[in-house]
Amino acid sequence: MLDDWIYIFLPRISCALAWVVNPIFVYFIFTEKSQTFGNYRYLLLFFALFNLLYSVVNVVVPIDIHNYRYCFFLILRHGWFVEISDFHYHMAAGRCSLVASSYALLLVHFIYRFLVIYDSSLTRLHFHWYMTGSLLLSVAYFVAWQTICWFLGYASVEMRQYVREEIRRTYGRDSMDFNMIGTLYDEASYEAKFKSWLATIIWSSISVASISAYMVLALLTIHKLKKMSCNASKKTSKFQFELLRALIVQTLIPIVISFSPCLLCWYTPIFGIQLPREFNYFEVGALGLFSFVDPIAIILCLPIFRHRISNFWKTSTTSLEEPSTKVRNI
């Protein structure tokens, strides 16, 4: 029953919440004055559309993550793509690659905030080129991750034999029947270990390089904003700080609840540490949360959106109270 909640119901609940929250988020953005967000509106729309796509894929391609001794592996448990085939394997790899694409999505947001502060023409006159570059960067991240999964992460017969008893004990099925992405760091042939280490190094390098870029761009933007505060209007400077703060929160959420558990699953098998099954449940569940948690965080971080929610709440409360008052007067 717990497996059904983790792998079937929780992704569907997350998807439903994403399809409620993200349209509201987009409505808030595009009903503000156009000069408030400028072209940044379209990057936020791109972000919301990505969240909707990811939430659907999270339901259609449900994954399970497990580790055993020196091996980490990811399999498909339910849905349309369980039967072993190259196409179904690519669907599993694509599910992982979408998570990697979110690195690119966050990166283009940080670059945009940096360029706005320096009044770059890419944020104004040539914004269509910036959006094109943003799309291409997201595709590049996706393709890079997909390629690594195919050439280095594809579970060999040796790896499947290594985890055969563990899979039979945990899932009641044979390891040869699963579409599997994995790494095997020890107790294996040189080729298997080499591919596993190379895959992990490349995955880690992409992750660390992306997060480092966020930090550098955020620090440079803050430094420039502090200089600008002397010349720019207080309102403009304050709003730019609020947008950057919202972006930092937007970035921290997937890093903490989604990417950090991934790193643990990659690295604990290096030392032969087997994580408890409950941690695997947590990780699978957490990977689906940011598609609706992130927009909520942005809405709550920006005062203009908080005020609109507050005003809506007050108006709704007042309209509900008025009929009851009239009834008492009668």
From Swiss-Prot:
Signal peptide: none annotated. Belongs to the nematode receptor-like protein srj family. It is found in: Membrane. GO terms for cellular component: membrane. Keywords: Membrane, Transmembrane, Transmembrane helix. It is a multi-pass membrane protein. The keyword Membrane applies. This is Serpentine receptor class J-38. The keyword Cell membrane does not apply. InterPro entries: 7TM_GPCR_serpentine_rcpt_Srj. The chain crosses the membrane at residues 6-26, 43-63, 98-118, 135-155, 200-220, 253-273, 285-305. It comes from the Eukaryota.
